[in-house]
Amino acid sequence: MDDPKSEQQRILRRHQRERQELQAQIRSLKNSVPKTDKTKRKQLLQDVARMEAEMAQKHRQELEKFQDDSSIESVVEDLAKMNLENRPPRSSKAHRKRERMESEERERQESIFQAEMSEHLAGFKREEEEKLAAILGARGLEMKAIPADGHCMYRAIQDQLVFSVSVEMLRCRTASYMKKHVDEFLPFFSNPETSDSFGYDDFMIYCDNIVRTTAWGGQLELRALSHVLKTPIEVIQADSPTLIIGEEYVKKPIILVYLRYAYSLGEHYNSVTPLEAGAAGGVLPRLL
């Protein structure tokens, strides 16, 4: 078995290759969509932002699993070494000049596209926030910001509980419930790279990572938390109907806000708070 440093180098090389492949895919997509087609251009920008966010999150989570005692300097040295290893053989002056010009043109086009994407994403963010403010306002609520640290879903849940419980405990209870109810959750999991269904061992590793890492939580984790708290959970979205999880429970629901464009790393959960003090209450959840 490889030592941790060798394993880290292998992961970094793969991440570099995957980023290059993604950028090539993005360039191909850009060339396939006319700049005059605003509808398709908007969808392209959404798809690009999603793909980049998913890859960034995937790479971050993979590196968390293989962190060792190496300093940041050693990682930089590894990256520099990889660049040297991947450097092409010397070529003619004319060939190098042509390559440099082509590289500069690609960088210029990429810069234009990134600026365009940033502008559009800022517009998507404003539009999303306005829609959510209207939906929440109709219910006498407003959004409450939660840090984007990988724990956002659990922190948003924690924010609405009347008892003291740590994010770590919520993660532990989520993973424990999922492990005890494998048949309820396992069919919905697959490998994001191969699309192969998870086996039992894969699922157990996934549950362990809920506890050990800052892995982002989603709908299945919310389902588990709904059972743990014996409480319905509502997820308000700008462009989709409100998702209700745990409808079989009768307590006052926990309400989360799901955002697609709030942060560059992708999806995010926020909490809510009443617009006015003294809002009507209900039977509040407790950790069982």
Curated annotation (Swiss-Prot):
Active site positions: D149, C152 (nucleophile), H268
Positions of region (Disordered): 1-20, 84-110
Annotated PROSITE patterns: OTU
Record bears the keyword RNA-binding: no
GO molecular function, one term: cysteine-type deubiquitinase activity
Compositional bias segments (type: Basic and acidic residues): 1-10, 99-110
Reactions catalysed, as given in the entry: Thiol-dependent hydrolysis of ester, thioester, amide, peptide and isopeptide bonds formed by the C-terminal Gly of ubiquitin (a 76-residue protein attached to proteins as an intracellular targeting signal)
Region described as His-loop: spans on this chain: 258-268
InterPro entries: OTU_dom (IPR003323), OTU_OTUD6 (IPR049772), Papain-like_cys_pep_sf (IPR038765), Peptidase_C85-like (IPR050704)
Keyword GTP-binding: no
Region (Variable-loop): 210-220
Location of region: Cys-loop: 146-152
Domain OTU: 141-275
Name recorded for this polypeptide: OTU domain-containing protein 6A
